[in-house]
From Swiss-Prot:
One of the protein's GO biological processes: bacteriocin immunity
Function: Imparts immunity to lactococcin-B to naturally sensitive host strains.
Protein's name according to its UniProt entry: Lactococcin-B immunity protein
UniProtKB keywords: Bacteriocin immunity, Plasmid
Domain of life: Bacteria
Length: 91
């Protein structure tokens, strides 16, 4: 349980840091802020993570993500792939 909380705090901290940077594109800030708002509203963490991954992937298909957000995206994908809670979870 502690590891899940640590992962949630780490991902949320990264998202918050990126959302506050001037270099982050407006659309990226909106996606990151949406995730942070989900966490603040107590959305189930795995669902929030999968939603975040989908939004970042969709945004990357429209236009390239900035370098730091792209690195963050890969961290999110890595976390999601390691988690067994993804199986059967529908966003």
């Amino acid at each position: 349980m502690k590891k899940k909380v640590d992962t949630e705090k780490q991902i949320t901290s990264w998202a918050s840091d990126l959302a506050s940077k001037n270099e982050t594109k407006v659309q990226e800030k909106l996606i990151l802020s949406s995730y942070i708002q989900d966490i603040e509203n107590h959305v189930y963490f795995p669902k929030a993570m999968i939603s975040l991954e989908k939004k970042l992937r969709d945004q990357n298909n429209i236009c390239a993500l900035s370098k730091e957000v792209n690195q963050f995206y890969f961290k999110v994908v890595e976390v999601n792939q390691r988690k067994s809670w993804m199986v059967g979870l529908i966003v």
